Curated annotation (Swiss-Prot):
A motif (Nuclear localization signal) lies at residues 165-271. Homodimer. Interacts with DAPK3. Component of the precatalytic, catalytic and postcatalytic spliceosome complexes. Part of a spliceosomal 'core' complex consisting of CDC5L, PLRG1, SPF27, CCAP1, CCAP3 and CCAP6. Interacts with PLRG1, Lodestar/TTF2, and NIPP1/PPP1R8. Component of the minor spliceosome, which splices U12-type introns. Within this complex, interacts with SCNM1. Component of the PRP19-CDC5L splicing complex composed of a core complex comprising a homotetramer of PRPF19, CDC5L, PLRG1 and BCAS2, and at least three less stably associated proteins CTNNBL1, CWC15 and HSPA8. There is a cross-link at residues 135, 219, 487 (Glycyl lysine isopeptide (Lys-Gly) (interchain with G-Cter in SUMO2)). This is Cell division cycle 5-like protein. Residues 118-127, 246-262 have a biased composition (Basic and acidic residues). Residues 260-606 are annotated as: Interaction with PPP1R8. It comes from the Eukaryota. Phosphorylated on serine and threonine residues. Phosphorylation on Thr-411 and Thr-438 is required for CDC5L-mediated mRNA splicing. Has no effect on subcellular location nor on homodimerization. Phosphorylated in vitro by CDK2. Phosphorylation enhances interaction with PPP1R8. Residues 108-143, 246-278, 409-459 are annotated as: Disordered. The gene is CDC5L. It is found in: Nucleus; Nucleus speckle; Cytoplasm. Residues 31-54, 82-104 bind DNA. One of its GO terms (cellular component) is Prp19 complex.
Length: 802
């Protein structure tokens, strides 16, 4: 009898590796081909193994408390729908079902008071795992069976074969074609060398014959060209860098060896300098050192300034009360206004409200699900199954947020209202004489009625509320009438220790300033210094205006010329010299960085620093104070006014200024090839074309930037106004529909009106016709009646005869 092979069983490590490699090669659709590599597994088992265990997206970590609560909640809402529950939790369906049964068994053990540390779902000796695809793989034995070795070698050979029969045949045909072409080429060359010319028969190819033609060939125009600018650099080949090890690069083994050597040297130096830390590092003790976690404190609910204000108010009221007692004022109004609120109940201040006891929600939900699973049929009757408090408000369970009670913000002498009992039971309180009310505290002194007793008030009754308002108004009126006459004999006296406190605050050095405040103050000082330094710079640097990359020193005139320079020319030369010095200084200390340079590198600057330094050594740059710069600016303003009055210059309008600016700007031309500006009348046609191309490119860049900005703004406005647009379109559609309905109704109205006119004119004619028909019918009926009577009489006569 042949041996029957039943596929399945525990998965081994070898089978897992073969399955992963096969999925990488064949994909996740050809499970039959993948299963042909594994002799003991079917295609369905391979697919289940991949989607239940080997898929890298499967989460195999410990279940968190939130996931367990969500699992039990969803199992309560959607029983047995594990394929629907699994993606919500982020686990597989088998994991959800297994952990759900684990929680139920754990709850059952707790109900039976059988606390065991073992997993209740663990297989017992002799049991067979019904779902081996969801369990870890069994390690491979050292001496594997021949069947497993044969399966492994076959899978290795099949998976290593990345080229099938068709690919090998194509490669062989391509190689034969290349050999045939080379042989024909050699034959034609030999015949041509022997003086025999053979015309090659070309087959018409659809594409380009790259063996006979030059693709994208552009033949130069006929004529002579100047080749003086075509300077070719001679190839200086360095044959020492053409060795095999230089071409291959550094080997990985050499790099690892060098790194190991560096680590040994570093460890040796560390042992020589810091022996204890090196011993800890080598012994591995440092792995067990636990880093202390950061202390997280809640934000203060009352600031220091508010506490100081409270203290000041308390001191002022205490001083006023003591002054009133010393002066002998004992009337009821003053005693009420100056009531003492300092003494607090220490037992209340020392009591900490307790937080509500937390409950094991997971255990409660598991017990509820077990109870619902084991419910008898409702046909038997009886009481419902007792359940814990459950939640059906949403897909995810509600989380109970535990908050620390705030004892700071409560009023010290607050009389508890109805239902305002705290979490901790209070001692020394008298219960209220109200039925079904929470016992409240004994009311403390409250002469100003700040905290009225509202435990017995029924604010839902409007008549009661109006009665309370009338009583409070009357009580206030009587109190105001009973006030004594005012006396303007008050004087303001500062406390004796106020000045001492101010001095102690100034002298107190024990206060440690916060590091963030220190950094902020230092940053503010640095910003102020930077602003000051910026104000001392030149206007071109302050406004980040374009500055020349090279200084043109040829603008200076020679001093020994004939005829000699005039005083005005000498002054102009001094101004030019100072300008050149300023340019050298700015190029050295504040090089210009164009805004279009996104990499943050200076283009064309920094290479002539030695030249700038040498010039500044011979012509030192002189720094001026703020006052000197202000005086120079005033002198320039005065000179401008003198020139303006002397040359009769008036106020230019914006149109005239723009016209002059456009005329001046049109005379200047930028040469991108030479990176400089020149006059437009001195430039050649080629330079003008290049300048216009550069300007066109810049304008296109601006246009692209503005288009992106406009698209971004359009997208933003679409997000902001999309609802309004859709609403407007809907209203327009409704308006059009209503207009169509109005037109249709108007047409129907006109139609029925015309129909009514025709009916009104046709009704009399119809009535006449009907009347005539009725009259004819009546006459016909009379004639027939007479004939009937005659025939009846004739019948009777004939009967009488016979």
């Amino acid at each position: 009898m042949p041996r029957i092979m039943i596929k399945g069983g525990v998965w081994r490590n070898t089978e897992d590796e073969i399955l992963k490699a096969a999925v990488m090669k064949y994909g996740k659709n050809q499970w039959s081909r993948i299963a042909s590599l594994l002799h003991r597994k079917s295609a369905k088992q391979c697919k289940a193994r991949w989607y239940e265990w080997l898929d890298p997206s499967i989460k195999k970590t410990e279940w968190s408390r939130e996931e367990e609560e969500k699992l039990l909640h969803l199992a309560k809402l959607m029983p047995t729908q594990w394929r629907t529950i699994a993606p919500i939790i982020g686990r597989t369906a088998a994991q959800c079902l297994e952990h759900y049964e684990f929680l139920l068994d754990k709850a059952a053990q707790r109900d039976n008071e059988e606390e065991t540390t073992d997993d209740p779902r663990k297989l017992k000796p002799g049991e067979i795992d019904p779902n081996p695809e969801t369990k870890p793989a069994r390690p491979d034995p050292i001496d594997m069976d021949e069947d497993e070795l044969e399966m492994l070698s076959e899978a290795r050979a099949r998976l290593a074969n990345t080229q099938g029969k068709k690919a090998k045949r194509k490669a062989r045909e391509k190689q034969l074609e290349e050999a045939r072409r080379l042989a024909a080429l050699q034959k034609r060359r030999e015949l041509r060398a022997a003086g025999i010319e053979i015309q090659k028969k070309r087959k018409k190819k659809r594409g380009v014959d790259y063996n006979a033609e030059i693709p994208f060939e552009k033949k130069p125009a006929l004529g002579f060209y100047d080749t003086s600018e075509e300077n070719y650099q001679t190839l200086d080949a360095d044959f020492r860098k053409l060795r095999q090890q230089d071409l291959d690069g550094e080997l990985r083994s050499e790099k690892e060896g060098r790194d190991r050597k560096k680590d040994k040297q570093h460890l040796k130096r560390k042992k020589e300098s810091d022996l204890p830390s090196a011993i800890l590092q080598t012994s591995g003790v440092s792995e067990f050192t636990k880093k202390r976690s950061k202390l997280v404190l809640p934000a203060p609910q009352i600031s220091d300034a508010e506490l100081q204000e409270v203290v000041k108010v308390g001191q002022a009221s205490e001083i006023a009360r003591q002054t009133a007692e010393e002066s002998g004022i004992t009337n009821s109004a003053s005693s009420t206004l100056l009531s003492e609120y300092n003494v607090t109940n220490n037992s209340i201040a020392l009591r900490t409200p307790r937080t509500p006891a937390s409950q094991d929600r997971i255990l409660q939900e598991a017990q509820n699900l077990m109870a619902l699973t084991n419910v008898d049929t409702p046909l038997k009757g009886g009481l419902n199954t007792p359940l814990h408090e459950s939640d059906f408000s949403g897909v995810t369970p509600q989380r109970q947020v535990v908050q620390t009670p705030n004892t700071v913000l409560s009023t010290p002498f607050r009389t508890p209202s109805h239902g305002s009992e705290g979490l901790t039971p209070r001692s020394g309180t008298t219960p209220k004489p109200v039925i079904n009310s929470t016992p409240g505290r004994t009311p403390l002194r409250d002469k100003l009625n700040i905290n009225p007793e509202d435990g017995m008030a029924d604010y839902s009754d409007p008549s009661y509320v109006k009665q309370m308002e009338r009583e409070s108004r009357e009580h206030l009126r009587l109190g105001l009438l009973g006030l004594p006459a005012p006396k303007n004999d008050f004087e303001i006296v500062l406390p004796e220790n106020a000045e001492k406190e101010l001095e102690e605050r100034e002298i107190d050095d024990t206060y440690i300033e916060d590091a963030a405040d220190v950094d902020a103050r230092k940053q503010a000082i640095r910003d102020a210094e930077r602003v000051k330094e910026m104000k001392r710079m030149h206007k071109a640097v302050q406004k980040d205006l374009p500055r020349p990359s090279e200084v043109n020193e040829t603008i200076l005139r020679p001093l020994n010329v004939e005829p000699p320079l005039t005083d005005l020319q000498k002054s102009e030369e001094l101004i030019k010299k100072e300008m050149i010095t300023m340019l050298h200084y700015d190029l050295l200390h504040h090089p210009y960085e164009p805004s279009g340079n996104k990499k943050g590198k200076t283009v064309g600057f920094g290479t002539n620093n030695a030249e700038h330094i040498a010039y500044l050594e011979h012509n030192p740059y002189e720094k001026f104070s703020k006052e000197e710069l202000k005086k120079a600016q005033d002198v320039l303003v005065q000179e401008m006014e003198v020139v303006k009055q002397g040359m009769s210059h008036g106020e230019l309008s914006s149109e005239a200024y723009n016209q002059v600016w456009e005329e001046c700007y049109s005379q200047v031309l930028y040469l991108p090839g030479q990176s400089r500006y020149t006059r437009a009348n001195l430039a050649s046609k080629k330079d003008r074309i290049e300048s216009l191309e550069k300007r066109l490119e810049i304008n296109r860049g601006h246009m692209t930037t503005e288009a992106k900005r406009a698209a971004k703004m359009e997208k933003k406005m679409k997000i902001l106004l999309g609802g309004y647009q859709s609403r407007a379109m809907g209203l327009m559609k409704q308006l059009n529909d209503l207009w169509d309905q109005i037109e249709q109704a108007y047409l129907e109205l006109r139609t029925f009106e015309e129909l009514k006119k025709h009916e009104d004119s046709a009704i009399p004619r119809r009535l006449e016709c009907l009347k005539e028909d009725v009259q004819r019918q009546q006459e016909r009926e009379k004639e027939l009646q007479h004939r009937y009577a005659d025939l009846l009489l004739e019948k009777e006569t004939l009967k009488a005869k016979f």
